[in-house]
């Protein structure tokens, strides 16, 4: 089987197999020959005895080192609800008696293809694991169809000895352990593959049946003198225009295609602070709010999240990307489309609001760009309130589960849209997205674009923000269906916090450092020795006076950064007997100003302090504080510091 099956193992943060010891028992949700074989193979590859060999330590002799929380019985049509609770209780009693001193329980979840369930699916009924025979048939086809995409998740180990210290008797301790792990598995499944998803048709029907959309349809009939059937069909058309058509098969194929694309385009993807995301992924509604630098952003975050064992987000994309051929693929990858403005279309607004609200209530991870469009300068754009306002209002009306915003920073060393941005900044009109433009853009596949950086910011809990702004918001929302006016203030504050959160996890890469130094020199040229000194100064400032704990910086030395810039085709060298001169061509200077602007906020305060001493060697502390207090608020507002 393992000539065909390919597994990827993801362990919980801090998981150290060397510290597990010899007395280890794995916990799985349900039995299955293929799952047990995968676990055995993983243990053998990790130089551990396979669980099927049993658990044999002083005081314990079990035929298997696996506890199943739900076991299949021998009924023909239905699986029994029996479990391995007696085995778990024997283990707990043995530890309680001191032989062995402790047993470590390791929850293990194995996913074949990671396909979310679909409500109302005939295929789900036919292949449901609630039917013993069908369950085996389903697993056979899963091995054949999804054997190349198997994810093994090892959760944080649980000490039986520590659980016994709570003072419960062995029977109750075993039951509590089983219940806690069972809840963990359910949450982990949702985090990994996403919640149950409706068919697109079912989702559209839910939207049209909702009171808010029904009221909007009636208003449409009155205002535009339509027949009720016409207004309803118009609403249905809007819903189909908006809704994603999520396909796990497209996600799996996209992962393979994108892996090869990234290998062709980039020299690696650096991921920072992923632990922050994993810490809040379980049990929360996640809304990813990244900065918007490139069209690659749409693909990059989904790829990074999926590769690290989390469910792909549904992404809000502009209707301009709903192109022939491309649009359906994006839609099946989780994209849902929105018009640039729908303030004057109440029916469309009602349909879109309900679609977003239903997805948030189901726990579907969402991604959208609060800047509204891609930055052409490299600096963050002010937050647009539209999607944030809809999200906050939806949560206030129906807080089904905690909602957490996760800021995400994207850093590039070269953009595939660089030339088009250059044209736009030169005054040319923005080129509209089209299929022909997409085909012409494929020429970038011949180029290299350096490294990509994806950093996750500190999560922002919406409920906490609402509690600060309006302590009685829950009671007010329950008592009235009106849109509370105070929400707009929360939305403005939230937008500012998200942008500040993005900047707080910026990635200072070699291109950004070189651009920062060279663009501040006359004629974009400098002696190599001076360039080395200036890069070392910037690195020392970033390390010695850090902007924040989330900022990541290149680990290359100043010399290596210059070498990198030359190999990357960014720097030019002119030899001279008094010392080589390093310079930027004019065209390169315009392009790399984008990457200097990515990190301008990091050097803003040191630069302000340096400017205060520009024409004097000394300055009283009071005068320095006065200068900073007058200028800094403008910098903070402009650069989202």
Features from the language model and the residues they span:
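Membrane-interfacial terminal anchoring regions of lipid-handling membrane enzymes
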Residues: 1-641
